[in-house]
Each structure stands twice: as C-alpha cells, then as structure tokens.
Amino acid sequence: SHFIILEGLSGTGKSSLPRYFAKFINANLLFVPVQATWRDKTNLIGYFNDFSKAYSETEFLTSLYHANYNPDMIHMFVLDEMNISRVEYYFADFLSVLEYPEEEWKIKIMQLPYNFIPPAKLDDGVIQIPNNVYFVGTANKDDSTFTITDKVYDRAITIDFDNRNDAFNVNGDASTINLSRSALAKLYQEAKNNKSYQMTDNDYQKFQTISDYIYDQFDITFGNRILNQISELVPVFVSCGGTKEEALDFLLSRKVISKIEGRFEEYVKNALSELLN
C-alpha cells in the first residue's frame, strides 16, 4: 500500500519509526505537521494568489514535484498527527486517486492562466503522484483528535501502537542499505509470483466462512477493495516470515472486526467468543 496509518498511544514511536526506516533504506523523507485548521487540499499543496499572481507553494508540493524527477528513489511523506483535523477533508483528493491505476495518480493543482507555460512536471496544472511516493500518517487516540472514518481506514494499511515496548538491542548490521524503488518493486513481485505464498482456493473458502459469520452476526460486510488488498498483502507478509493465517488475521481485525468498536451488547461478546473458538 502507498498509504499507511500508524495509530495508537502518544509516545509509542509512531513518528520515530518512519524516520529511522527512511534512514535505513536511504529514502527521502518529509515530515508534514498537520494543523487543526486544515480543511482542504490547499493546506497541503498551496494555492494561487490572485493578488500577487503567483502560486504560493508548500514544501509538500515541492517534494512531490522533485519525486517525479527521481523515480527510483523512495519518497516518504509523513502526515504527523494526521487526525488532528479531518483526514477526509484535506486528503480527499489523494484518497480518491490512489484507488486508480498508477498512471492516473494525478492531482489538479490549479487552472493555468492563458498562454502560461507550466513547469515540465506540471502539465496543464496537474501533478503526477509517482509510484515511488508513500504516505504515512501518524494518528493519536485521544480527545484532541478526530475519529478516523471507515472511508480512510479502508484505503490504508493500519498498524496499531497500543502498547509501550521495552528497549532492545539490534543484533546484526543496521547500516543503510540504499533500497531503490525498482529493487523494492522487484521484491514485491517475487513474493506475489511465489505460488506457495499465494492464497489458495481453500484459503479463500476459509476466509469466506469467517466473512459470512461476521455478516450474519454483526451485519458487517466489505467490498472488493479488501479482497484486492488480501491478494496483494498476503504473499508479501508470508515472504517476510509470517503466515497466511496471520496476514488474514491482521487484515480482518483492522478492516472488518474493528467496525464493531463501540458496540457493547452481550450478544456481541458471545458472538466474538464463538468466532475465536
């Protein structure tokens, strides 16, 4: 996924993880502190000033533009405390286009004035989001933030930071490895092509049985987006040392069962216990 959410308690390392990971793979990193007043995409990409007749650009837009000139270098954009404002307001355009094929990942920046010659990577006032760009959002769970909606969760891979972990020492070499976008894509493709990592018909049947149970008990279902995410994530998860069952558990718990949050009826507890058994 090109959109990842790190969510949980404050002070558990959500902001540190992308910082150190970017350093480890030698990726370009931009931290964007989200503000509570953000309401639309202009807070991220800037706007055209009618008085000065100039575009007031942001560091976010500049970095996105530069990413188009460095297609083999991974660029990470960290939206720090992303839910201090409503994500679906200022990030709506990005949420939509990331659902399309990669060649259609385009954001309209501005309507160009007549006879205006745009920069090379800003054709017709539109900027391409290249596939070497990854968005990472850090999100706290407290009274100062907004609840992240299902629309956002469904389009992202969410990693929970619910517990404080003890310090540990890294065994082995932790020096920078200079991972390029093409090398990363090759690793993805190798994992997806490995038949032993892929979901089998039997795996899908087991998953369907659980899905039917969740629908019957909680009236919760999901669309093809999650099925596509399963086919993409499971092989990569297994290639990293996990199992198919763990990968499905990861997705089900965050994409489907999380929708039960806030329901306290006794039948919910009983149905969940039966599901676990």
Where are these regions (language model features)?
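AAA+ P-loop NTPase catalytic core and its hallmark functional loops
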Residues: S1-S182, K186
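Alpha-helical lid/collar subdomain of P-loop NTPases
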Residues: N171-N277
